[in-house]
Amino acid sequence: MEISAEQLKKLNNGEYTVYDIRSETDRAYGFIPGSVHTTADELENNPPADRDKKIIIYCAHGVFSIDIADRLCEQGYEAYSLEGGYLAWMRYEMQNRQDSELCQKVEQSLRKKFRVSI
């Protein structure tokens, strides 16, 4: 099962845990805030005790994490692979920042031009 970056952002914090199965080197370049670093073997062999929380797993491109998510689903967990992996999450975050920055620029322009509060 897969989940998109947009769907992940819509989940409530307490209902899931995000696991980063990339290498330490990859993680040093960036990671999803709040994610737990682990290895694929560790996650598969010692899954979380709390079966009520969704498990979101990501790797660099979403290729390796989907296999782990499938195997955890077979064990009765609600596990998802982040579609497109960390790179897709980064693209989503960058797009949202650009949209937010654009909105701020438009708002500033309107305030300046019309001298009104929005």
Question: Which residue stretches match the model-derived regions?
Answer:
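Rhodanese-like catalytic fold shared by cysteine-dependent sulfurtransferases
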Residues: 1-17, 24-54, 63-118
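Short, surface-exposed ligand- or partner-binding patches at beta-edge/loop junctions that are enriched
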Residues: 58-59
